[in-house]
Amino acid sequence: MTAQLIDGNALSRQLRAEVAQRATALKARGTTPGLAVVLVGDNPASQVYVRNKVKACEDAGFHSVLEKYDASMTEAELLARVEALNNDPSIHGILVQLPLPAHIDDHKVIETISPLKDVDGFHVASAGALMVGEVGFKACTPYGCMKMLESIGMKDLRGKHAVVIGRSNIVGKPMAMMLLAANATVTICHSGTADLAAMTRQADIVVAAVGKRNVLTADMCKPGAVVIDVGMNRNDEGKLCGDVDFDGVKEVAGFITPVPGGVGPMTITMLLVNTMEAAERAAG
């Protein structure tokens, strides 16, 4: 049995088309969705991510602002820029690209973003809303993973055991909360887990999000499981790969996301969805 692919590019195209329609409708009422992207320093990977985000905004008919600053920018200067964007009515979403230079406190910057414009879903208010089931912006990567599950008919996960490998604030923790909200029984595994394979072999759904190659191999996978690979790594030939041993696991799993072309495009798509929702809320 070879697993069916969950195509993140195809699902993204569908969802982005829906966002573009919503943007057109909102613009007809006099409001253009606006996203500000702030980049500090010249990290090559960050530059690529930022470029892709700005292009996706423009393709959806959004107003986008890209602010690039030298790595020598002070924390106080960056916080002042974020406050200015908080007060700009044409901007509905603010994204500060991480990582920031070492002298700037990521947490302080994220907490300065207005929760009403926190389209990355990283603010403590957004995380708290997710925890208690209130309305708030969901972190884009796990939100995209949930949409991928929905696309294969897995919206209500009652009776399903989901294992999340990774406990980051950006993916692992919010992923677990979203799976829990969908009625899954959730296990979170990490570097302190004694027997990872014993956990994953019981899992109907595995989300791998640690940034380490081959963290999930075929012998660790339950036949027919759904495997979502959030990882972004390079193999020995320098090619992009995920956290999952794709060639091995696809012979055991029922569904699997590829890398590239899986979770990656969905992350940007859900950023657009969040920005669209922020603009609609602001417009009333």
From Swiss-Prot:
CDD domains: NAD_bind_m-THF_DH_Cyclohyd (cd01080). The keyword Oxidoreductase applies. NADP(+) binds at G166, R167, S168, S191. Catalyzes the oxidation of 5,10-methylenetetrahydrofolate to 5,10-methenyltetrahydrofolate and then the hydrolysis of 5,10-methenyltetrahydrofolate to 10-formyltetrahydrofolate. Belongs to the tetrahydrofolate dehydrogenase/cyclohydrolase family. Keywords: Amino-acid biosynthesis, Histidine biosynthesis, Hydrolase, Methionine biosynthesis, Multifunctional enzyme, NADP, One-carbon metabolism, Oxidoreductase, Purine biosynthesis. GO terms for biological process: L-histidine biosynthetic process; methionine biosynthetic process; purine nucleotide biosynthetic process; tetrahydrofolate interconversion. InterPro entries: Aminoacid_DH-like_N_sf, NAD(P)-bd_dom_sf, THF_DH/CycHdrlase, THF_DH/CycHdrlase_cat_dom, THF_DH/CycHdrlase_CS, THF_DH/CycHdrlase_NAD-bd_dom. The gene is folD. Homodimer. The keyword Transcription regulation does not apply. Pathway: One-carbon metabolism; tetrahydrofolate interconversion. One of its GO terms (molecular function) is methenyltetrahydrofolate cyclohydrolase activity. PROSITE patterns: THF_DHG_CYH_1 (PS00766), THF_DHG_CYH_2 (PS00767). It catalyses: (6R)-5,10-methylene-5,6,7,8-tetrahydrofolate + NADP(+) = (6R)-5,10-methenyltetrahydrofolate + NADPH; (6R)-5,10-methenyltetrahydrofolate + H2O = (6R)-10-formyltetrahydrofolate + H(+). This is Bifunctional protein FolD. It comes from Delftia acidovorans (strain DSM 14801 / SPH-1). Transmembrane segments: none annotated. Its EC number is 1.5.1.5, 3.5.4.9. GO terms for cellular component: cytosol.
